[in-house]
């Protein structure tokens, strides 16, 4: 049975942990800047027209590439989470303590918010698009969609990055993670927006001042990420081991 470790103040404020928080902040900022920036660019080029298939592909590819790079640049320092749902999933599997994970969340949310503030400034005040479910769908349907696609993301993180038996598969973890996010945006984008990431949705909501549907992008991803962490960590990895360093799961 996997054990969840709460952690200690000393560990969470060690030099290594502080460096990890900075790495999460920077990597999340760069990911969200590119991801949300691609959506803003689409709206500008199309005069805020409805998202068409070409635009969906462009936004999905931008997120996939940006996440691939973001995970890669943070992997050796923080593990390259960039996502509270990933952090929760890894905490459920015993790969990071709850306390340290909480500070990861803060760094990720701050990174996303700063990215969106920068986008608002450099685009001369263009609207920062927020996530929301499509017309005709309800919040529960959006939550279920986000549970499924976030489960797929965190399951991929476990299989390619966190599993002790991953071997050489770990070298493709960042690109596999980017691929699953891009694919999920193609599948879910027209319905729930395809967030999979509370931080990705939080920053735009803060800058736009619109939290009307933001709960969907906390509930769905956290449930999906937690389930993936429990199933892969408990069923497939199967036993608790001492908390690894970031290099062991990134």
UniProtKB/Swiss-Prot annotation:
Tell me which UniProt keywords the record has, alphabetically.
Answer: Membrane, Repeat, Transmembrane, Transmembrane helix, Transport, Vacuole
Do you know which Gene3D superfamilies this protein is assigned to?
Glycerol uptake facilitator protein
Classification via CDD domains: MIP (cd00333)
Q: Name one GO molecular function term.
A: water channel activity
Instruction: List where the motif NPA 2 lies.
Output: 197-199
Where is it located? Vacuole membrane
Q: What is its main location?
A: membrane
Pfam families according to UniProt: MIP (PF00230)
User: One GO CC term of this entry?
Assistant: plant-type vacuole membrane
UniProt motif NPA 1: location: 83-85
Q: What does the entry state regarding organ or tissue expression?
A: Roots.
Task: Extract the PANTHER family matched here.
Answer: AQUAPORIN TIP2-3-RELATED, AQUAPORIN-8
What is stated about domains? Answer: Aquaporins contain two tandem repeats each containing three membrane-spanning domains and a pore-forming loop with the signature motif Asn-Pro-Ala (NPA).
Family per record: Belongs to the MIP/aquaporin (TC 1.A.8) family. TIP (TC 1.A.8.10) subfamily.
Protein name per Swiss-Prot or TrEMBL: Probable aquaporin TIP-type RB7-18C
Which species is this record about?
Nicotiana tabacum (Common tobacco)
């Amino acid at each position: 049975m996997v054990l969840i470790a709460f952690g200690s103040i000393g560990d969470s404020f060690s030099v290594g942990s502080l460096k990890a928080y900075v790495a999460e902040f920077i990597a999340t900022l760069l990911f969200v800047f590119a991801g949300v920036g691609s959506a803003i660019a689409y709206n500008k080029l199309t005069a805020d027209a409805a998202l068409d298939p070409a635009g969906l592909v462009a936004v999905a590819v931008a997120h996939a590439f940006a996440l691939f790079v973001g995970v890669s640049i943070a992997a050796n320092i923080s593990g390259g989470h960039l996502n509270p749902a990933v952090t929760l999933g890894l905490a459920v599997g015993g790969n990071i303590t709850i306390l340290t994970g909480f500070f990861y969340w803060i760094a990720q949310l701050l990174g996303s918010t700063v990215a969106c503030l920068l986008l608002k400034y450099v685009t001369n005040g263009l609207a920062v698009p927020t996530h929301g479910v499509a017309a005709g769908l309800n919040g529960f349907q959006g939550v279920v969609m986000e549970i499924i696609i976030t489960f797929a993301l965190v399951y991929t993180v476990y299989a390619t990055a966190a599993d002790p038996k991953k071997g050489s598969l770990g070298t493709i973890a960042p690109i596999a993670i980017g691929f699953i996010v891009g694919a999920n945006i193609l599948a879910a984008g027209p319905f729930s927006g395809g967030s999979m990431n509370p931080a990705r949705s939080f920053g735009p909501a803060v800058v736009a001042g619109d939290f009307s549907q933001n709960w969907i992008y906390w509930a769905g991803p956290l449930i999906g990420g937690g389930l993936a962490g429990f199933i892969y960590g408990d069923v497939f990895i199967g036993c608790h081991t001492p908390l690894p360093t970031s290099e062991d799961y990134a």
